[in-house]
Protein backbone atom coordinates (compact mmCIF):
# COMPACT_ATOMS: atom_id res chain seq x y z
CA UNK A 1 0.00 0.00 0.00
CA UNK A 2 2.74 2.46 0.95
CA UNK A 3 5.77 0.84 -0.72
CA UNK A 4 6.51 1.97 -4.25
CA UNK A 5 6.83 -0.36 -7.23
CA UNK A 6 10.63 -0.16 -7.40
CA UNK A 7 11.04 -1.34 -3.79
CA UNK A 8 8.49 -4.12 -4.31
CA UNK A 9 10.43 -5.27 -7.38
CA UNK A 10 13.64 -5.32 -5.33
CA UNK A 11 11.95 -7.34 -2.59
CA UNK A 12 10.73 -9.84 -5.19
CA UNK A 13 14.20 -10.15 -6.75
CA UNK A 14 15.91 -10.65 -3.37
CA UNK A 15 13.34 -13.27 -2.36
CA UNK A 16 13.82 -15.28 -5.55
CA UNK A 17 17.62 -15.05 -5.31
CA UNK A 18 17.67 -16.21 -1.68
CA UNK A 19 15.30 -19.10 -2.34
CA UNK A 20 17.44 -20.34 -5.21
CA UNK A 21 20.74 -19.85 -3.40
CA UNK A 22 19.52 -21.62 -0.26
CA UNK A 23 17.85 -24.39 -2.23
CA UNK A 24 14.57 -24.14 -0.34
CA UNK A 25 11.78 -26.35 -1.68
CA UNK A 26 8.44 -25.51 -0.14
CA UNK A 27 7.78 -22.56 2.13
CA UNK A 28 10.30 -19.93 3.15
CA UNK A 29 9.72 -17.06 5.55
CA UNK A 30 11.59 -13.78 5.04
CA UNK A 31 11.49 -10.63 7.12
CA UNK A 32 12.49 -7.32 5.55
CA UNK A 33 12.99 -3.89 7.08
CA UNK A 34 12.75 -0.71 5.01
CA UNK A 35 14.47 2.44 6.27
CA UNK A 36 14.03 5.27 3.80
CA UNK A 37 15.15 3.71 0.51
CA UNK A 38 17.43 1.14 2.16
CA UNK A 39 16.14 -2.43 2.27
CA UNK A 40 17.45 -4.89 4.87
CA UNK A 41 16.93 -8.64 5.19
CA UNK A 42 16.39 -9.39 8.87
CA UNK A 43 16.07 -13.16 8.68
CA UNK A 44 15.30 -16.08 6.39
CA UNK A 45 13.66 -19.24 7.73
CA UNK A 46 13.01 -22.41 5.66
CA UNK A 47 9.59 -22.92 7.22
CA UNK A 48 6.04 -21.66 7.31
CA UNK A 49 4.93 -18.75 9.49
CA UNK A 50 1.70 -17.28 10.79
CA UNK A 51 1.59 -15.19 7.63
CA UNK A 52 0.81 -18.28 5.51
CA UNK A 53 -2.90 -18.58 6.40
CA UNK A 54 -3.26 -14.81 6.06
CA UNK A 55 -1.78 -14.88 2.55
CA UNK A 56 -3.84 -17.94 1.63
CA UNK A 57 -7.06 -16.13 2.56
CA UNK A 58 -5.95 -12.94 0.82
CA UNK A 59 -5.21 -14.59 -2.54
CA UNK A 60 -7.51 -17.61 -2.43
CA UNK A 61 -4.85 -20.30 -2.78
CA UNK A 62 -4.11 -23.20 -0.37
CA UNK A 63 -0.50 -22.10 0.09
CA UNK A 64 0.43 -24.74 2.69
CA UNK A 65 -1.04 -27.54 0.57
CA UNK A 66 0.81 -26.34 -2.53
CA UNK A 67 4.09 -26.13 -0.59
CA UNK A 68 3.63 -29.67 0.74
CA UNK A 69 3.06 -31.04 -2.75
CA UNK A 70 6.11 -29.20 -4.08
CA UNK A 71 8.22 -30.54 -1.20
CA UNK A 72 6.97 -34.02 -2.17
CA UNK A 73 8.34 -33.61 -5.69
CA UNK A 74 5.64 -31.92 -7.76
CA UNK A 75 6.36 -28.77 -9.73
CA UNK A 76 4.54 -25.44 -9.54
CA UNK A 77 3.96 -25.41 -13.30
CA UNK A 78 2.30 -28.81 -13.16
CA UNK A 79 0.05 -27.60 -10.35
CA UNK A 80 -0.97 -24.56 -12.41
CA UNK A 81 0.23 -22.12 -9.76
CA UNK A 82 0.80 -18.51 -10.79
CA UNK A 83 1.71 -15.39 -8.86
CA UNK A 84 -1.39 -13.52 -7.76
CA UNK A 85 -1.33 -9.80 -7.08
CA UNK A 86 -4.83 -9.07 -5.78
CA UNK A 87 -6.61 -5.81 -6.61
CA UNK A 88 -8.06 -5.68 -3.11
CA UNK A 89 -6.27 -4.83 0.14
CA UNK A 90 -5.90 -7.22 3.08
CA UNK A 91 -4.74 -5.79 6.42
CA UNK A 92 -3.46 -7.91 9.30
CA UNK A 93 -4.34 -6.28 12.63
CA UNK A 94 -2.81 -7.53 15.90
CA UNK A 95 -4.94 -8.27 18.94
CA UNK A 96 -3.41 -7.35 22.30
CA UNK A 97 -4.26 -8.68 25.78
CA UNK A 98 -3.59 -5.41 27.62
CA UNK A 99 -7.14 -5.05 28.99
CA UNK A 100 -6.74 -8.32 30.91
CA UNK A 101 -3.62 -7.18 32.78
CA UNK A 102 -4.02 -4.21 35.11
CA UNK A 103 -1.07 -1.84 35.16
CA UNK A 104 0.58 -3.10 31.98
CA UNK A 105 1.83 -0.37 29.62
CA UNK A 106 0.41 -0.54 26.12
CA UNK A 107 3.40 1.02 24.40
CA UNK A 108 4.98 -1.25 21.79
CA UNK A 109 8.61 -2.20 21.25
CA UNK A 110 10.65 -4.77 19.33
CA UNK A 111 9.30 -7.72 21.31
CA UNK A 112 6.08 -9.45 20.29
CA UNK A 113 3.16 -8.54 22.54
CA UNK A 114 0.13 -9.53 20.47
CA UNK A 115 -1.76 -12.73 21.27
CA UNK A 116 -3.70 -13.00 18.04
CA UNK A 117 -4.42 -11.45 14.67
CA UNK A 118 -7.44 -10.60 12.55
CA UNK A 119 -7.89 -9.71 8.90
CA UNK A 120 -9.64 -6.76 7.35
CA UNK A 121 -10.23 -7.01 3.60
CA UNK A 122 -11.74 -4.46 1.21
CA UNK A 123 -11.15 -2.74 -2.11
CA UNK A 124 -9.09 0.06 -0.53
CA UNK A 125 -6.79 0.44 2.44
CA UNK A 126 -8.99 2.66 4.59
CA UNK A 127 -11.96 0.30 4.51
CA UNK A 128 -9.74 -2.75 5.09
CA UNK A 129 -8.07 -1.10 8.09
CA UNK A 130 -11.45 -0.10 9.52
CA UNK A 131 -12.78 -3.64 9.20
CA UNK A 132 -9.62 -4.98 10.81
CA UNK A 133 -10.03 -2.61 13.75
CA UNK A 134 -13.64 -3.69 14.21
CA UNK A 135 -12.59 -7.35 14.16
CA UNK A 136 -9.97 -6.57 16.82
CA UNK A 137 -12.61 -4.95 19.03
CA UNK A 138 -11.70 -1.32 18.29
CA UNK A 139 -14.47 1.07 17.24
CA UNK A 140 -13.10 4.17 15.56
CA UNK A 141 -15.07 7.37 16.23
CA UNK A 142 -17.04 9.34 13.66
CA UNK A 143 -16.81 12.73 15.36
CA UNK A 144 -15.44 14.46 18.44
CA UNK A 145 -12.12 15.66 19.86
CA UNK A 146 -8.81 13.98 19.08
CA UNK A 147 -5.94 14.24 21.56
CA UNK A 148 -2.46 14.44 20.01
CA UNK A 149 0.88 14.50 21.80
CA UNK A 150 3.98 13.56 19.83
CA UNK A 151 7.74 13.64 20.29
CA UNK A 152 9.70 16.46 18.66
CA UNK A 153 10.82 14.46 15.61
CA UNK A 154 7.18 13.61 14.82
CA UNK A 155 5.77 17.15 15.00
CA UNK A 156 6.09 17.75 11.25
CA UNK A 157 5.04 14.20 10.39
CA UNK A 158 1.80 14.47 12.35
CA UNK A 159 0.57 17.53 10.43
CA UNK A 160 -1.01 15.51 7.55
CA UNK A 161 -2.87 13.48 10.18
CA UNK A 162 -4.12 16.68 11.81
CA UNK A 163 -5.18 18.14 8.47
CA UNK A 164 -7.02 14.96 7.53
CA UNK A 165 -8.87 14.72 10.82
CA UNK A 166 -9.89 18.39 10.75
CA UNK A 167 -11.15 17.93 7.18
CA UNK A 168 -13.30 15.09 8.51
CA UNK A 169 -14.83 17.44 11.09
CA UNK A 170 -12.85 16.48 14.20
CA UNK A 171 -11.48 19.02 16.66
CA UNK A 172 -7.89 18.67 17.85
CA UNK A 173 -6.58 18.95 21.40
CA UNK A 174 -2.87 18.71 22.20
CA UNK A 175 -0.23 19.30 24.83
CA UNK A 176 1.53 22.67 24.60
CA UNK A 177 4.53 21.66 22.50
CA UNK A 178 2.48 19.70 19.99
CA UNK A 179 -0.22 22.39 19.91
CA UNK A 180 2.39 25.04 19.07
CA UNK A 181 3.55 23.02 16.06
CA UNK A 182 -0.03 22.42 14.91
CA UNK A 183 -0.96 26.09 15.23
CA UNK A 184 2.23 27.17 13.46
CA UNK A 185 1.08 25.08 10.49
CA UNK A 186 -2.20 27.02 10.43
CA UNK A 187 -4.50 24.46 12.06
CA UNK A 188 -6.82 25.21 14.99
CA UNK A 189 -5.90 23.39 18.17
CA UNK A 190 -6.91 23.52 21.82
CA UNK A 191 -4.36 23.06 24.62
CA UNK A 192 -4.75 20.60 27.46
CA UNK A 193 -2.46 20.12 30.46
CA UNK A 194 -0.16 17.19 30.91
CA UNK A 195 -0.82 15.31 34.14
CA UNK A 196 2.20 16.88 35.85
CA UNK A 197 0.98 20.39 34.90
CA UNK A 198 -2.11 20.18 37.08
CA UNK A 199 -5.83 19.68 36.68
CA UNK A 200 -7.86 19.66 34.58
CA UNK A 201 -5.45 17.54 32.53
CA UNK A 202 -5.61 15.09 29.67
CA UNK A 203 -6.45 12.08 31.86
CA UNK A 204 -9.44 13.99 33.27
CA UNK A 205 -10.60 14.64 29.71
CA UNK A 206 -10.27 10.94 28.88
CA UNK A 207 -12.21 9.86 31.97
CA UNK A 208 -14.93 12.41 31.17
CA UNK A 209 -15.17 11.05 27.60
CA UNK A 210 -14.26 14.45 26.18
CA UNK A 211 -11.71 12.78 23.88
CA UNK A 212 -12.63 10.10 21.33
CA UNK A 213 -9.22 9.24 19.84
CA UNK A 214 -5.61 9.38 21.07
CA UNK A 215 -2.43 9.71 19.00
CA UNK A 216 0.61 9.62 21.26
CA UNK A 217 4.23 8.99 20.29
CA UNK A 218 7.05 9.21 22.79
CA UNK A 219 10.73 8.41 23.26
CA UNK A 220 12.97 8.10 26.29
CA UNK A 221 12.33 6.41 29.63
CA UNK A 222 11.06 9.51 31.43
CA UNK A 223 8.69 10.52 28.62
CA UNK A 224 7.33 6.98 28.46
CA UNK A 225 6.68 7.00 32.21
CA UNK A 226 5.04 10.43 32.02
CA UNK A 227 2.61 9.33 29.29
CA UNK A 228 1.77 5.92 30.80
CA UNK A 229 -1.41 7.20 32.45
CA UNK A 230 -2.66 8.53 29.10
CA UNK A 231 -2.30 5.19 27.35
CA UNK A 232 -3.67 3.19 30.27
CA UNK A 233 -6.70 5.45 30.75
CA UNK A 234 -7.49 5.33 27.03
CA UNK A 235 -7.41 1.54 27.26
CA UNK A 236 -9.67 1.30 30.31
CA UNK A 237 -12.10 3.83 28.81
CA UNK A 238 -12.09 1.91 25.50
CA UNK A 239 -10.89 4.96 23.59
CA UNK A 240 -8.92 4.07 20.43
CA UNK A 241 -5.27 5.05 20.70
CA UNK A 242 -2.31 4.89 18.32
CA UNK A 243 1.34 5.13 19.31
CA UNK A 244 2.75 5.73 15.82
CA UNK A 245 2.20 8.40 13.18
CA UNK A 246 1.45 5.76 10.54
CA UNK A 247 -1.22 4.30 12.82
CA UNK A 248 -2.83 7.70 13.26
CA UNK A 249 -2.84 8.32 9.52
CA UNK A 250 -4.28 4.87 8.89
CA UNK A 251 -7.05 5.63 11.38
CA UNK A 252 -7.88 8.85 9.53
CA UNK A 253 -8.19 6.91 6.27
CA UNK A 254 -10.34 4.31 7.98
CA UNK A 255 -12.72 6.95 9.34
CA UNK A 256 -12.93 8.51 5.88
CA UNK A 257 -13.78 5.12 4.38
CA UNK A 258 -16.47 4.50 6.99
CA UNK A 259 -18.03 7.85 6.10
CA UNK A 260 -18.43 6.58 2.53
CA UNK A 261 -20.60 3.74 3.82
CA UNK A 262 -21.88 1.22 1.29
CA UNK A 263 -20.52 -0.15 -0.94
CA UNK A 264 -17.06 0.53 0.51
CA UNK A 265 -17.79 -0.89 3.96
CA UNK A 266 -20.45 -3.42 3.00
CA UNK A 267 -19.80 -7.02 4.11
CA UNK A 268 -18.58 -9.18 1.26
CA UNK A 269 -17.89 -12.91 1.14
CA UNK A 270 -14.24 -13.94 0.96
CA UNK A 271 -15.15 -16.17 -1.99
CA UNK A 272 -16.29 -13.11 -3.93
CA UNK A 273 -12.84 -11.57 -3.57
CA UNK A 274 -11.23 -14.82 -4.70
CA UNK A 275 -13.57 -15.12 -7.68
CA UNK A 276 -12.66 -11.59 -8.78
CA UNK A 277 -8.98 -12.60 -8.98
CA UNK A 278 -9.67 -14.76 -12.01
CA UNK A 279 -12.74 -13.10 -13.46
CA UNK A 280 -13.09 -9.59 -14.80
CA UNK A 281 -10.85 -6.51 -15.00
CA UNK A 282 -8.85 -5.21 -12.08
CA UNK A 283 -10.66 -2.25 -10.45
CA UNK A 284 -8.71 0.95 -9.79
CA UNK A 285 -7.23 1.22 -6.31
CA UNK A 286 -7.53 4.31 -4.17
CA UNK A 287 -4.28 5.99 -3.05
CA UNK A 288 -2.23 4.45 -0.25
CA UNK A 289 -2.45 6.03 3.17
CA UNK A 290 0.90 7.82 2.84
CA UNK A 291 -0.46 9.75 -0.16
CA UNK A 292 -2.90 11.80 1.89
CA UNK A 293 -6.63 11.61 2.38
CA UNK A 294 -8.81 11.51 -0.73
Predicted regions and their residues:
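Surface-exposed amphipathic alpha-helices with a cationic face
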Residues: 161-167, 179, 183, 235
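Short glycine-rich anion-binding loops that position phosphate/pyrophosphate groups of nucleotides
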Residues: 47, 152-153, 218-222
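ATP-dependent carboxylate activation and anion-phosphoryl transfer catalytic cores
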Residues: 1-142
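Peripheral docking tails and interdomain loops at the edges
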Residues: 193-194, 202-294
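Short internal beta-strands
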Residues: 147, 169-181
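Glycine-rich phosphate/diphosphate-binding loops that line cofactor/substrate pockets in enzymes
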Residues: 134-146, 165-167, 205-211
Amino acid sequence: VNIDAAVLAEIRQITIALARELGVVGLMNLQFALQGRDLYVLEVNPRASRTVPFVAKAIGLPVAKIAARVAAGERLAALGVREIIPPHVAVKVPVFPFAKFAGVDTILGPEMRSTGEVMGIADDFGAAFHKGQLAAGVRLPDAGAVFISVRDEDKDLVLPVVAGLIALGFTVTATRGTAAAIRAAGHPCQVVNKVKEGRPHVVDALVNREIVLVINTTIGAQAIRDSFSIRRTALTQRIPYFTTISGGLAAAHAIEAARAGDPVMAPRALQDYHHALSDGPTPPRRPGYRQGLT
